[in-house]
Amino acid sequence: KDFILKGYNLDKGSSHFKLGPLKIISDGSLGARTAYMRNFYEDDKTTKGISIYNKEILQELISTAHDNNMSVAVHAIGDGAIEMAMNCIEVAIKNNPKKDTRHGIVHCQITDEMLLNRFKKLDLIAYIQPIFIHYDQHILEDRVGKELAKTSYNWKTLIDLGVVVCGSSDCPVESFDLMNNLYCAVTRKDLNGYPEEGYNKSQCLSIEEALKCFTIGGAYASFEENLKGTLEVGKFADMVVLDEDIYRCDKNKIKDININMTIVGGDIKYSL
């Protein structure tokens, strides 16, 4: 709160260093059963996880950011945490209506249909980390049950609803290797190729959709879609050169594609 009230907001920064959105961690993780759930965990009926803040404090944090020209990106994994974050964002917007706030939920893993639809209703950005499929598919149903698992990690549904989906690596918790993320997004398999048909395969993204998450989606989230995210005249020439055509290769081999060159602002910064 002190940080925001000192005037740090979305107007600060440069083309290479930009403030915002404000990260707020509201719960824990699915693996540790600390993601905050509406109901008790299926495999531990003694806990619903951990909510870092009560709703009053979370509301104060989100409203302070909203009122002072700062978007929020709320870490919320469990359905209880996601619902609380959405409720607080909705109140902040209702009390101080603004256009183009670009608030979002980070991870947004455990969802039902109502929560998925609220992403669109509230015009929230969904920050996803496809690499989580590698591990979480093996524990998801045990943690939350089969029914809730069906509507969780539903990235394709979010895209079809018209939600802006922003892909990220979750580095340093996970590797910065984005090829593994793209692989998991389009195959819904772990890095060992399991399951053969993909976990909840109806939620597989096309390679075009996955690439948009990690390019246009990220640019939009930082209010920079007019500067980056696509290769167009007048935009930064930020790009990589791959050793294989990602549009044509076997999708199961995406994780094995190498980066031959990195170009930033039209200048080669790395090459083999």
Q: PLM features: what roles do these ranges have?
A:
Residues 10-11, 250-254:
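Short proline/glycine-enriched turn/loop segments at secondary-structure junctions
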Residues 4-8, 169, 249:
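Short beta-alpha junctions and helix-cap segments that line functional grooves
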Residues 16, 254-255:
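Short solvent-exposed loop/turn micro-motifs enriched in small/polar/acidic residues
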Residues 1-79, 83, 118-125, 130-131, ...:
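Metal-coordinating catalytic core of metallo-dependent amide/deamination hydrolases
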Residues 62-73, 80-103, 107-108, 113-117, ...:
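His/Asp/Glu-enriched, well-ordered alpha-helical/loop segment
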